[in-house]
């Protein structure tokens, strides 16, 4: 898998955010506990204690560079606690302030001014300046995935206006530009040398105490500009498998098993000393149907496949009930997501008729390419193949090695599975995977009306008018795109009974532990 693909996944939910999803025979989900670690209203948050967190990763893929490719969730967690980004996912909005306290666009939505938070300092006491931010963003832009991390913003278009004001000038009008600052916009001190990056002081709520082989201890930053941090320390332990991580939590060796998955959640359901935290809309697992050419280019064929799938059965069996059905639109975590577009249901008779009208060759067997890059992906392909056979479509599931899949299949094959974090915006997915000029147009889709709606959305500042345009964009995607989004997987954490106020946002939002505390 290439660097760009990994970084885009982290933009939403991180690598392996589906955890240990697997087909189970049990029903539609365990005890919902999205407020699990919040504590009761009568409890007062306490200071102190060390939170021990398990996170997925491989020792061979460890990175210490905040602007590198974080293939390990453990690395991203550590980096996110030490180094703040300019913005973060919000509870009610796509973007909330962090190291940047505010931002304001020009009238044409091309020039944006970001203000560095008052009182923000590096861990060595040095004030954070606009020059530090500019240097860091230019370093980020120079990475192999830089164009995807800061699309439309060239290095020369990143400048400091004064000590606390950073100016970003986009090549085009972009009402969603602040979204870009939620990703890996970690800020380092200007001119930090590459051989000092691993131990460079950050600006986050925790300071690095030690790091060994992917494991780390972080201690509270008492001078954090973002407010009082409750925990004394966070210890992060790296685990190569969700099951090993779950076992460590059940044995009391760690307090939190992050992104542990549905199988472990089922195991923990009977434990009164363990809480299951569900983060809705954490991972989308669509089937991609190539629209540019091949057997699925006819929109009637794509519609037939969408009508042939049993979405509720997919969620129940593939996700063990820890998820929700999809409606073939990416960006389900966006407040602008069009929930009023009619939900597709299963209609085998209509599917067969559409296939006949399109002259689809039902005598042929078609390959559906997948990989076990995340657990549950291959299982979803197998169940999908079984379901669409009832409409007369014969599918042969081909499991590929992840490297082969991402190098030879992704963006090219007529029919394959993929996965994305879904707490990103509708416009994010449009820009990355669906507009005609996208370099990662997974289905090879070209639809002038969609492109026009996308450009209009980027250039519209008025909230009411923008909402109308975004709705139109989603209607087109729902009707014509190459995606069959049958469901979204919940992110699942396991937490010991004393843990309080774990974040419930999907994707990057779940690594914000500055308000977490321990009732012990």
Residue ranges and their predicted role:
Residues 222-267, 394:
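Ligand-site clamp/hinge motif
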Residues 257-347, 372, 376, 439-448, ...:
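Local pocket/hinge segments that shape ligand/substrate recognition
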Residues 54-107, 201-202:
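N-terminal lobe/hinge region of extracytoplasmic solute-binding protein
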Residues 2-3, 8-21, 26, 309-335, ...:
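Detector for C-terminal structural segments
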């Amino acid at each position: 898998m290439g660097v760009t693909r990994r970084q885009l996944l982290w933009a939403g939910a991180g690598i392996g955010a589906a955890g240990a999803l697997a087909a189970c025979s049990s029903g539609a989900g365990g005890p919902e506990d999205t407020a699990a670690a919040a504590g009761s209203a009568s409890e007062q948050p306490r200071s102190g204690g060390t939170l021990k967190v398990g996170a997925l990763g491989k020792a061979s893929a460890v990175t210490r560079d905040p602007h590198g490719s974080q293939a390990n969730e453990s690395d991203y967690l550590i980096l996110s606690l030490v180094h703040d980004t300019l913005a973060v996912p919000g509870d009610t909005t796509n973007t909330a302030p962090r190291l940047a306290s505010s931002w304001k666009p020009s009238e044409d939505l091309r020039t944006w001014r970001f203000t560095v938070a008052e009182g923000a300092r590096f861990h060595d006491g040095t004030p954070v300046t606009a020059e530090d931010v500019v240097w860091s963003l230019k370093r980020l832009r120079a990475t192999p995935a830089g164009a995807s991390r800061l699309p439309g913003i060239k290095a020369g278009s990143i400048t400091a206006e004064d000590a606390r004001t950073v100016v970003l000038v986009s090549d085009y009008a972009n009402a969603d530009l602040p979204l870009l600052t939620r990703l890996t916009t970690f800020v380092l001190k200007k001119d930090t040398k590459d051989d000092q990056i691993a131990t460079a002081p950050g600006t986050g709520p925790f300071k690095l105490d030690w790091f060994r082989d992917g494991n780390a201890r972080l201690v509270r930053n008492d001078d954090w500009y973002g407010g009082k941090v409750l925990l004394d320390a966070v210890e992060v332990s790296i685990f190569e498998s969700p099951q090993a991580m779950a076992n460590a939590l059940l044995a009391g060796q760690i307090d939190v098993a992050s992104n542990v998955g549905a199988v472990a959640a089922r195991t923990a359901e009977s434990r009164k000393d363990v809480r299951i935290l569900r983060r809705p809309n954490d991972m989308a697992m669509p089937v991609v149907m190539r629209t540019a050419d091949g057997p699925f280019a006819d929109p009637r064929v794509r519609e037939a496949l969408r009508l042939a799938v049993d979405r509720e059965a997919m969620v129940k069996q593939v996700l063990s009930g820890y998820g929700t059905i999809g409606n073939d639109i990416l960006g389900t975590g966006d407040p602008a997501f069009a929930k009023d577009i009619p939900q597709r249901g299963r209609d085998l008779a209509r599917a067969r008729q559409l296939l006949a009208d399109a002259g689809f060759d039902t005598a042929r067997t078609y390959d559906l390419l997948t990989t076990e890059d995340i657990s549950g992906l291959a299982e979803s392909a197998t169940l999908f193949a079984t379901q669409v056979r009832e409409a007369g479509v014969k599918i042969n599931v081909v499991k590929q090695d992840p490297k082969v899949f991402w190098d030879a299949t992704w963006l090219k094959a007529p029919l394959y599975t993929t996965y994305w974090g879904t707490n990103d915006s509708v416009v994010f997915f449009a820009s990355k995977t669906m507009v005609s000029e996208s370099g990662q147009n997974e289905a090879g889709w070209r639809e002038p009306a969609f492109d026009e709606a996308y450009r209009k959305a980027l250039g519209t500042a008025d909230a009411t008018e923008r909402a109308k345009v975004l709705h139109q964009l989603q209607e087109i995607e729902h009707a014509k795109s190459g995606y069959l989004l049958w469901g979204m997987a919940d992110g699942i954490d396991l937490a010991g009974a004393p843990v309080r106020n774990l974040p419930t946002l999907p994707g990057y939002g779940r690594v914000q532990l500055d308000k977490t505390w321990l009732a012990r």
